[in-house]
UniProtKB/Swiss-Prot annotation:
Known function: The central subunit of the protein translocation channel SecYEG. Consists of two halves formed by TMs 1-5 and 6-10. These two domains form a lateral gate at the front which open onto the bilayer between TMs 2 and 7, and are clamped together by SecE at the back. The channel is closed by both a pore ring composed of hydrophobic SecY resides and a short helix (helix 2A) on the extracellular side of the membrane which forms a plug. The plug probably moves laterally to allow the channel to open. The ring and the pore may move independently.
Transmembrane found in the keyword field: yes
Major localization class: membrane
Organism: Geobacillus stearothermophilus (Bacillus stearothermophilus)
GO biological process, one term: protein transport
Keyword Cell membrane (UniProt): yes
Membrane topology term: Multi-pass membrane protein
Keyword terms: Cell membrane, Membrane, Protein transport, Translocation, Transmembrane, Transmembrane helix, Transport
Protein family: Belongs to the SecY/SEC61-alpha family.
Designated name of the protein: Protein translocase subunit SecY
Length: 99
């Protein structure tokens, strides 16, 4: 919430360089948030459509098709699995310090 973020920055004495605290900060954060949302949504749309486009261009069999959303899910699960494996390795590394 840009309004809440601007208020919190103002209360804590923080500011964005070149932007006055208060309403100007709120408008700036809103503008940046809209830009990031637009870029992110365009990127996700391209990722979702690209696999279908390549499958149709390469004339692959229907069994080889994978949708963009499926690709996003697979990558998300793979990244989460890597994080969990890394945390387990770190946990094992620190187990020697506990004993």
């Amino acid at each position: 919430n840009p309004e809440q973020m601007a208020e919190n920055l103002k209360k804590q004495g923080g500011y964005i360089p070149g932007i006055r605290p208060g309403k100007n900060t709120q408008e700036y954060v809103t503008r940046i948030l809209y830009r990031l949302t637009l870029v992110g949504s365009v990127f996700l749309a391209v990722i979702a459509v690209l696999p279908v486009f390549f499958v149709n261009v390469a004339n692959l069999p229907p069994s080889a098709k994978i949708g963009g959303t499926s690709l996003l899910i697979v990558v998300g699960v793979a990244l989460e699995t890597m994080k969990q494996l890394e945390s387990q390795l770190v946990k094992r590394h620190y187990r020697g310090f506990i004993k």
